[in-house]
């Protein structure tokens, strides 16, 4: 019997490469998305046929999973056998989050969202190479909550180039004010 089996699905596509990111990502190969997702589904089906255990956790990260149409991303998730109580997380860019996307994720079995906030200070976001603005963070959290997610986290980064202690304090205050279950 397996005590736990985690699955990580990497979506390597990004609108822009963040300056701090060391992951394998591409900003110029979005035309490969359909083929990449088909390859993922094929690989998962073969793994299941070879006695892949039920997943106790699934994390869909990147890259930027939210660049992939939500229904297509859920078609990949649907191939994974899930254990009862499995935590299924999708990493999300605040620029991309919509209520419809979050509702599609919920209906597809996602039960946790990870929002890449990084900072709520404009010049810090720019130094990190992020494209969203602080206002998108509040809107994103509202969409996540409205879609019924009780579990979500806000990722933040400390020590970005040019970030002051006041900037960091502002980000912490802003994030705490949003009352996320996890940071």
Question: Residue ranges of each PLM-predicted region?
Answer:
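Flexible, acidic/Gly-rich N-terminal and inter-domain linker regions that tether
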Residues: 1-5, 15, 42
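N-terminal [4Fe-4S]-dependent radical SAM core
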Residues: 1-8, 51-54
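Structural motif
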Residues: 4-6, 18, 87
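Residues at the beta-strand->loop junction immediately N-terminal to the Walker
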Residues: 8-10, 61-62
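Local cysteine-cluster metal-coordination motifs and their immediate loop/turn environment
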Residues: 10-25
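Conserved non-cysteine loop/helix-boundary elements of the Radical SAM core domain that shape
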Residues: 25-183
């Amino acid at each position: 019997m397996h005590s736990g089996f985690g699955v990580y699905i990497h979506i390597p596509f990004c609108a822009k490469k963040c300056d701090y990111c060391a992951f394998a990502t591409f900003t110029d190969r979005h035309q490969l998305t359909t083929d990449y997702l088909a390859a993922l589904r094929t690989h998962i089906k073969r793994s299941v046929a070879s006695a892949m255990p039920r997943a106790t956790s699934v994390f869909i990260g990147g890259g930027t999973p939210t660049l992939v149409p939500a229904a297509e991303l859920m078609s990949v998730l649907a191939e994974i056998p899930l254990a009862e109580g499995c935590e299924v997380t999708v990493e999300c860019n605040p620029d991309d989050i919509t209520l419809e996307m979050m509702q599609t994720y919920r209906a597809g079995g996602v039960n946790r969202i990870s929002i890449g906030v990084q900072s709520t200070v404009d010049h810090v976001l720019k130094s990190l190479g992020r494209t969203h603005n602080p206002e998108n963070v509040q809107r994103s959290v509202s969409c996540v909550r409205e879609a019924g997610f009780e579990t979500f986290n806000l990722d933040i980064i400390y020590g970005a180039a040019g970030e002051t202690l006041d900037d960091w304090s502002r980000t912490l205050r802003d994030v705490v004010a949003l009352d996320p279950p996890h940071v």
